[in-house]
């Protein structure tokens, strides 16, 4: 009987990597950690979900099942790619070395990413633009709903979608036209993440390191997936949760846990 070869590795989420910008990302420190794993004789790097957490921060509560987290984009990488200058980062280098101020990181990084996206629009090469167009076409099946949801989120002051007007009253060509630049930048963020992630993954694989990923069991209520497909979840007529996810009492938590995701409508 053949068995899988014995392997070992380390669980360390990307955000837990050290770095000067308040939160770990898929930049130089991630490549360095690959080197460390290789030198230790490890072959696996386990990480938590990489999805776009929005303002929730929790990797198990994501805005989209498919979109990746722009907060994990390497700012140093954006400098190397020509979309940022070192001067752009001077105003965000005053972080604590032992604690993460998530709100500050969230605010600062998205301001910097906005600058990078503006520079991408202005100066990306023809070859890069072709890759970007191909990325958008290949991922249209989820990207179109994601950018629409995020645009409506912005227009509704980041409020939960159950407080919005009905979809047919919100969605129209005018919204797309009036927010075209914002929408384009959402696409660029997703593209930049994938470009950087593929470089990290390729480097890790060359060093004999494979990633062990993770995905949430359920889908977050305030997500594009539930907003666009409410019939797939246990919701009432107002979009509120009828049955939610959780965990019964166990050794780790005598009271049990409420996770807050809507249950699936298996029918």
Residues of each region from the PLM?
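Conserved, mostly hydrophobic/aromatic
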Residues: 37, 47, 149, 204, ...
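Short alpha-helical segments and helix-capping/turn motifs at coil-helix boundaries
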Residues: 28-35, 134, 195-203
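Conserved, well-ordered alpha-helix/loop/beta-strand core segments that scaffold catalytic motifs
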Residues: 186-220
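Active-site mouth loops of central-metabolism enzymes
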Residues: 17-28, 261-267
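Short, solvent-exposed turn/loop segments enriched in Gly/Ser/Thr/Pro and often Arg
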Residues: 46-56, 215-221
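Catalytic domains of carbohydrate-active enzymes, especially glycoside hydrolases
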Residues: 2-3, 28-53
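Alpha-amylase-like alpha-glycosidases and glucanotransferases acting on alpha-linked glucans and related
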Residues: 2-6, 13, 56-194, 219-267
């Amino acid at each position: 009987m053949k068995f899988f070869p014995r392997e070992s590795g380390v669980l360390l989420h990307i955000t837990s990597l050290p770095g000067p910008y308040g939160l770990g990302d898929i930049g130089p420190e991630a490549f360095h950690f690959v080197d460390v794993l290789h030198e230790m004789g490890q072959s696996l790097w386990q990480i938590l979900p990489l999805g776009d957490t929005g303002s929730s921060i929790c990797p198990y509560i994501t805005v989209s099942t498919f979109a990746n987290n722009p907060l994990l984009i390497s700012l140093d990488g954006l400098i190397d790619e020509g979309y940022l200058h070192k001067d752009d980062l001077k105003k965000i280098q005053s972080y604590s070395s032992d604690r993460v101020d998530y709100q500050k990181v969230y605010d600062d990084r998205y301001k910097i990413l906005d600058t990078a996206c503006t520079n991408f629009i202005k100066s990306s090469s023809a070859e890069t633009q072709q890759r970007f167009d191909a990325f958008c076409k290949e991922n249209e099946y989820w990207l179109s709903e994601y950018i629409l949801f995020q645009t409506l989120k912005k227009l509704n002051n980041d409020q939960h979608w159950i407080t919005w007007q009905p979809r047919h009253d919100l969605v129209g060509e005018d919204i797309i036209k009036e927010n075209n630049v914002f929408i384009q930048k959402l696409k660029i963020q997703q593209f930049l993440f994938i470009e950087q992630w593929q470089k990290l993954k390729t480097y890790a694989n060359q060093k004999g390191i494979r990633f062990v990923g993770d995905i949430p069991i359920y889908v977050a209520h305030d997500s594009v997936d539930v907003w666009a497909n409410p019939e797939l979840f246990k919701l009432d007529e107002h979009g509120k949760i009828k049955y939610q996810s959780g965990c019964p009492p166990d050794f780790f938590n005598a009271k049990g846990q409420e996770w807050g995701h809507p249950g699936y409508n298996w029918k």
